[in-house]
């Protein structure tokens, strides 16, 4: 395809969420695959709700995801401005063109007049449509009322019969009866255009070839086509992306884990993983592949492979995918991911860098997210403050628990060197001497050293912790078991 120009046009009234990020990604992929341009436009004419910090957050979110744009409010371009709030003169010219051609008119009906019409429609049990009383006003009458300072909106004259067909590249032709529409407002009483008018003028004047956007905008598209045709402008191609639903097929919300892109970044998710996951929300090549590089996505992406059916958001799958990307990181990148938090916690300083690296290496495959990785690192740097409740019942609550840990303490105290291989050999030899399973020594030791029932391999864990820490924690665990035997299981905290 030639001269492909697509845009992502968010309203800065909140954060960049998953739906918006997916829309941006699909536009970006389509542009990059076809050698086209990806334009960022900020639709900020809702002056009451638009916020500059939201606009900045959206820009930062796209940058973090690696979705670079070719034209936009920060870098400019030949067809700007790229903020609607700076395009007032452009909109005014096109509005005047419609007024001059008789395809639009001023409406002076007051809110009270319109409310009365709505109430009459409700009483008669019919859908409300504007009655069109101002359509009959002569130009000189409208001019007199404007000069008198009477507030007015501008309405488009909509054909009373026929259909408006939306040719959709994903859904095929979608037909809307013109009888559904009234003469809808295209400019408010303050002179600023409504969304549907502004977006038509912007897309045409920025030479947008394809409009890829969420399915929720499909109902706006026939109104926009009516505006294109009234102005005699070339229409872009449209493709409406299916909705993203929660696992129970309800509307997606924060309670389903659908947080903003910035919140995912703050939680330490990797941008590559989020981009990969977003791409699979509604796009599939039919290949049984979950992990796609950006280059592979750009090569394979096509509108033909976008589903009409809703995509299902699955936070567990996203976490799994993030884990796959974390496993592929080299140790330096993985350490950089957790260093700020580790330093903040007081875990990392110039004296224990090697120890920190060994700990990260050991637990790296047990974490799907940065926060899980930090959680897995905790007991390497902080004393065990609480033992797992089920673990206490299973491994510390038995009469032999104290005996088992005493045996381990003796083994550990008498070790010359402290390698994982030598520790394992010593444990298994002692288990053989005591005619017990090695697991009878291993499980209570794991709980004593970490407070947990699941960790990386115990002997590797012990080697990293070091002999001194292991002895100290075994002694504390024995003390805890003694109190447990004396006082009963009132609680599992210890200081």
Curated annotation (Swiss-Prot):
A single BP term in Gene Ontology: glutamyl-tRNA aminoacylation
Motif 'HIGH' region: positions: 10-20
Location of this chain's protein in the cell: Cytoplasm
Presence of the UniProt keyword Protein biosynthesis in the record: yes
Motif ('KMSKS' region): 251-255
Enzyme Commission number, as recorded: 6.1.1.17
Any one Gene Ontology molecular-function term assigned to this protein's record: ATP binding
Catalysed reactions, semicolon-separated: tRNA(Glu) + L-glutamate + ATP = L-glutamyl-tRNA(Glu) + AMP + diphosphate
Cellular component terms per the entry's GO annotation: cytosol
Keywords: Aminoacyl-tRNA synthetase, ATP-binding, Cytoplasm, Ligase, Nucleotide-binding, Protein biosynthesis
Binding positions (ATP): 254
Classification via PANTHER family: GLUTAMATE--TRNA LIGASE, GLUTAMATE--TRNA LIGASE, MITOCHONDRIAL-RELATED
Subunit structure: Monomer.
Record function comment: Catalyzes the attachment of glutamate to tRNA(Glu) in a two-step reaction: glutamate is first activated by ATP to form Glu-AMP and then transferred to the acceptor end of tRNA(Glu).
Family listed: Belongs to the class-I aminoacyl-tRNA synthetase family. Glutamate--tRNA ligase type 1 subfamily.
Protein name: Glutamate--tRNA ligase 1
Species this chain originates from: Syntrophomonas wolfei subsp. wolfei (strain DSM 2245B / Goettingen)
Organism taxonomic ancestry: Bacteria, Bacillati, Bacillota, Clostridia, Eubacteriales
